[in-house]
């Protein structure tokens, strides 16, 4: 886990399940927030950014983070060096270099493929630029998950990833993975 622990902003519909999941995440060392929607999740995340006062920030690609608008807030903050390795049209080598720098930023934000009711987080990461910073690097990590990410068990998390990861991979130019064509992630040890 990152030095200061991770913060978790989550929004979903079923408050009972959410509170249970949040409690299990907290037992694993996460600060957890249950909020009713994306707007409120963005407000919590902005509050955490103010609390952390990072001099640098980066992110792992996440449609939910983009929808929340938090990335635009970080980009426009003159006090934060924002490492954005996802700029369209940027040369591949430059993207890699910026993503490497982002892994040691003061703040890293990302989504997650699935969260089990047991309080476990599940990812499949094509290049590792989301998982690596969550495990080590930034002083602070904020994870954001929508209701679509909550599953009952780790086995259900793996099944969700098998179905969803190929759809997500299709969004990225220049990547050619087998699952993009078959529609099913087929890793042996997932």
Specify the residue positions occupied by each region the protein language model found.
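Short, functional N-terminal and low-complexity linear motifs
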Residues: 7-13, 38, 123-126
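N-terminal active-site beta-alpha-beta segment that forms phosphate/nucleotide-binding
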Residues: 14-99, 104-109
